[in-house]
Amino acid sequence: MASTDFRPLHDRVVVRRVESEEKTKGGVIIPDTAKEKPQEGEIVAVGSGARDESGKVVPLDVKAGDRILFGKWSGTEVKINGEDLLIMKEADIMGVIG
């Protein structure tokens, strides 16, 4: 998805989940029904930032391309251009990987 297809507002980000492993280290294949949804993703697009008390826009700490960790129940699942993505607030992000 190109970042121009959808632009989140304010302090929201669009995240693509990173696919979880299909096999365990021991070689056991994990069926889709038993897999947990990954809590790791890549930021696809970011909003302009939230406004502080004085009305000034505070830019986000994350940017498109960052790999992040987020909470299990974070965000809202959406389908944009046929791709399953998440929209969440920056506060739902626990940290940036790397």
From Swiss-Prot:
Q: What InterPro entries does its record include?
A: Chaperonin_GroES, Chaperonin_GroES_sf, Chaprnonin_Cpn10_CS, GroES-like_sf
Per UniProt, the keywords (alphabetical) are: Chaperone, Cytoplasm, Plasmid, Stress response
GO-annotated biological processes:
chaperone cofactor-dependent protein refolding
Q: Where in the cell is it found?
A: Cytoplasm
Q: Chief subcellular site?
A: cytoplasm
Show the GO MF annotations.
ATP binding; metal ion binding; protein folding chaperone; protein-folding chaperone binding; unfolded protein binding
A single Gene Ontology CC term:
cytoplasm
Subunit comment: Heptamer of 7 subunits arranged in a ring. Interacts with the chaperonin GroEL.
- In UniProt terms, what function does this protein have? Together with the chaperonin GroEL, plays an essential role in assisting protein folding. The GroEL-GroES system forms a nano-cage that allows encapsulation of the non-native substrate proteins and provides a physical environment optimized to promote and accelerate protein folding. GroES binds to the apical surface of the GroEL ring, thereby capping the opening of the GroEL channel.
Q: So what family is this one in? A: Belongs to the GroES chaperonin family.
Task: Name the chain's protein.
Answer: Co-chaperonin GroES 4
The species is: Rhizobium meliloti (strain 1021) (Ensifer meliloti)
